[in-house]
UniProtKB/Swiss-Prot annotation:
InterPro entries: Ribosomal_uL3, Ribosomal_uL3_bac/org-type, Ribosomal_uL3_CS, Transl_B-barrel_sf. Gene3D superfamilies: 3.30.160.810, Translation factors. PANTHER family: 50S RIBOSOMAL PROTEIN L3, LARGE RIBOSOMAL SUBUNIT PROTEIN UL3C. Belongs to the universal ribosomal protein uL3 family. This is Large ribosomal subunit protein uL3. GO terms for biological process: translation. The gene is rplC. The keyword Ribosomal protein applies.
């Protein structure tokens, strides 16, 4: 499935021809290069390995150098992603925004904002206890288990804990505008992650669902 590695710049708004305001997220793309291929004969499936953003020289180890020794004019990359089912490219090729020209909707994967340790009301949208006088708890979790049977708290019970910092995919975001000169696209709505975080933009898997 076709995709690119981009950077979330932030949100803004644009006006459509009829005057309707549309909130959009700006995603910027540095050059994306094909740095490797997988084939059915050798690996059991077809895929392209794509990289973006040059790695700092202090971070380049000998094993990493070895992976790029057969690629001309392609520096080791910081972000490396595998896209399955893609053909038609060779190692060293650059994939640009023209890949999205005919695409109306995209799926975007990013890492959500980290919120730190949060209570059950914020983390799981619990309603909490009564706020009135005489109540013994207001924002506490409450009971997490049963009586003598089974006499324990089950794994996976919703509790307070670390919130955010997880991979999340938003599907069917409309591509509002493609700016090839600035190597950026505008998509309708919000995208997971903080400003400056890197995201994976793919052709929508379930358009119109």
């Amino acid at each position: 499935m076709l995709g690119l590695i981009g950077k979330k710049v932030g949100m803004t708004q644009v006006f459509q021809g009829n005057g309707v305001v549309v909130p959009v997220t700006v995603i910027e793309f540095e050059p994306n290069y094909i740095i490797g291929k997988k084939t059915v004969e050798r690996d059991g499936y077809d895929a392209l390995i794509m990289g973006s953003v040059d790695l700092k020289s202090s971070k380049i180890s000998k094993p990493i150098k070895g992976q790029y020794k057969n690629l001309e004019n392609v520096e080791p990359k910081k972000y490396v992603i595998e896209f399955k089912g893609l053909k038609g490219y060779d190692a060293g090729d650059e994939v640009g925004l023209d890949a999205f020209k005919e695409i109306k909707y995209v799926d975007i994967t990013g890492t959500t904002k980290g919120k730190g340790f949060q209570g059950a009301m914020k983390r799981h949208n619990f309603s909490g206890g009564p706020s009135s006088h005489g109540s013994k708890f207001h924002r506490h979790l409450g009971s997490t288990g049963q009586a003598a049977t089974p006499s324990r708290t089950f794994k996976g019970t919703k509790m307070a804990g670390r919130m955010g910092g997880e991979q999340q995919t938003i599907q069917n975001l409309e591509v509002v505008f493609i700016d090839e000169e600035k190597r950026a696209i505008l998509v309708k709505g919000a995208v997971p992650g903080v400003k400056g975080s890197f995201v994976i933009v793919k052709k929508a898997k379930k358009v119109g669902v």
